[in-house]
Amino acid sequence: MIRTEEMLLNVGPQHPSTHGVFRLVIKIDGEIIKEATPVIGYLHRGTEKIAESLQYTQIIPYTDRMDYLSAMTNNYVICHAVETMIGLEIPERAEYLRVLAMELGRIASHLVWWGTNLLDIGAVSPFLYAFREREMIINLLNELCGARLTFNYMRVGGVKWDAPDGWIEKVEEFVPYMREQLAGYHDLVSGNEIFLNRVKGVGIYSAEEAISYSLSGANLRCTGVNWDLRKDEPYSIYNRFDFDIPVGSVGDAWDRYVCRMQEIEESLKIVEQAVQQFPKEGAVLAKVPKIIKAPKGEAFVRIESPRGEIGCYIASDGKKEPYRLKFRRPSFYNLQILPKLLKGENIANLITILGGVDIVLGEVDG
């Protein structure tokens, strides 16, 4: 008589496909996953508690290290929260630089996701192409702020530095180049029969389930929910740009793939328009005291990061440090649906599903 026994298997915390220190304890019966339990906290640094002893400007470098693949949006959300509290008006040129930095960062983040996700399921070449284009974006951001990954570029009231001479022209040249490469990506991967068999019908959830789990970003839009804060609750100068919000219909790994690939195209549209509208002169930083004291009260802001809805709550008692600071970290919320998606799945689909959710462990652990 053939008999199988359930087995506990640890995926991580040093597994290459987790792209960070993340442990997944799975119970398997043969090749079927019966139960999956995420174990997080390996990268917890107590960012929110540390912030209570820092001045507002000193908090900005810490946000770089949450979602380190999209540090510009993290920079922005803390600055935006403080600016909301003190009622600060941002110079127009600074707003355009912020949008350019954030959208270039969004493209770079999605390129990392595209390359690593495909590498994890067996396609090596796309990884090399993705990092080739990402390197061009990183070089552009390096020229802008002097850093490649943890930028510390934005400030309460604007940005630290103006764009160097010729930088806008380089960004303008990058847009058609990236569009051409993106078409090549689709030719290489998006119609590949082997790839389609790995992602279509895998990791399905409904719009109702996505909302109940507080999912956001492509993980929400893949179910058909048309919700993007850049459109639905415009911040900065996003209401000046014409772009679409990609949505799916089935809510599987394929829809999540399509949404993110189309988001790259829409980000290129925003970058192109921002370059065309870019003010020829003007300040990049409002007049702000060196030591910022937010008035007593509280504020909550939220913006659209590559991984979803990132929020920042600040409670102030009138001092130069926040009384309480809280981040809504989208990767943490998006991770919560993983046990449901994995239950009953073949173990071969584990990495496809995990990669499709697209978490960053620095953001999960905070």
Curated annotation (Swiss-Prot):
The keyword Secreted does not apply. Its EC number is 7.1.1.-. InterPro entries: NADH_Q_OxRdtase_suD (IPR001135), NDH1_su_D/H (IPR022885), NiFe-Hase_large (IPR029014). One of its GO terms (cellular component) is plasma membrane. Its main location: membrane. Pfam families: Complex1_49kDa (PF00346). It catalyses: a quinone + NADH + 5 H(+)(in) = a quinol + NAD(+) + 4 H(+)(out). Keywords: Cell membrane, Membrane, NAD, Quinone, Translocase, Transport. One of its GO terms (molecular function) is quinone binding. SUPFAM superfamilies: HydB/Nqo4-like. It is a peripheral membrane protein. It is found in: Cell membrane. Belongs to the complex I 49 kDa subunit family. NDH-1 is composed of 14 different subunits. Subunits NuoB, C, D, E, F, and G constitute the peripheral sector of the complex. NDH-1 shuttles electrons from NADH, via FMN and iron-sulfur (Fe-S) centers, to quinones in the respiratory chain. The immediate electron acceptor for the enzyme in this species is believed to be a menaquinone. Couples the redox reaction to proton translocation (for every two electrons transferred, four hydrogen ions are translocated across the cytoplasmic membrane), and thus conserves the redox energy in a proton gradient. This is NADH-quinone oxidoreductase subunit D.
